[in-house]
Structures are given as structure tokens and as C-alpha cells.
């Protein structure tokens, strides 16, 4: 039981690295055709980008199936992927992109840091020059803003972190 729990926890942690890599090099690379829908105004309930969730869920289901058929660690790795997917769904789709019927914007703490970091990711038009590709771990918003200024030679014209009044000042109440 303890080993299984440890595998799940380590899988969730590993998924952050895998998700950041996938987001940066696949979604902003050859998978941009799907992911671009996530960087443009949404029309309707779903985005083409949602197909990535279906693919990742398929991998998790396959791991759980193979694991329950005899390769026991795989079911717990699949479980860890599922937990990460749930966290991603709650925070990314619910909190940041407000794809749910309720709308809440964090005003302080780590959730605000996640919120602002992802909004800064969307501050750049297109797939090049973005920051913050992971989601459970987020750098300080001030650091991300400095990277954006360095990459673009100016603050981004579209600073998505300032689209909402309570996210306007990421350095004022963001955790250090």
C-alpha cells in the first residue's frame, strides 16, 4: 500500500515534467494545429486542444489495464497520471480559463501564482516566445515578465495577466 501510494505521488510529480516537455515541444511544435485552438478565443464548449486530454487519458487507461493484468506498477503510474489530469482539469480549465459556470480569481498565494503564470503564457500571440509551460510548478510572475521582456525587447503588447483587475499586479501579492 505504501509503495503504491509512493508510485502515485512520484507519478504526479513526474507528470509535471512530462506535461511541461509535451506542452513546450509537442503542443507548441508539431502539435500546434490542435493546441492553437487553446490560444485563440473559444467558440463553443470544446476546443480542438481538448483532444490532447483524450490522448493522455487513453495512455492512463492503457497503463491501468496492463497494470491490473499483471504488471502491477503500471496501474499505479496510470493512477498518478489520472490524478495529475484531475488537478490540471480543476486548476487549468476551471480556475484559469474559467470553463466552468462559477468564476473565481485567486487574489494571493500559490493559486494566484499559477493563475498569473499561465496568463503570462498566453500573453504572447502564436507559439513562439512563450513562458511557463508546466502547471503545478510556476515561477514567480516577476521572473516570467522579465523573460518576456528579454525575449521580445519590450513588455508584451498583450499582457494577459492584466486582463483582470485582481491579477493586475502579480508582484504585489504573489508568493516569493
From Swiss-Prot:
State the top-level EC class. Answer: oxidoreductase
Organism, scientific name: Pseudescherichia vulneris
Q: Which gene produces this protein? A: crtZ
Feature: compositional bias, Basic and acidic residues: 156-166
Q: Which residues form the Fatty acid hydroxylase domain?
A: 10-126
E.C. designation(s): 1.-.-.-
GO MF annotation terms: beta-carotene 3-hydroxylase activity; iron ion binding
Protein name stated in the entry: Beta-carotene hydroxylase
Entry annotated with the keyword Cell cycle: no
Q: What family is this protein classified in? A: Belongs to the sterol desaturase family.
Entry keywords, A to Z: Carotenoid biosynthesis, Oxidoreductase
Region: Disordered, residue numbers: 152-176
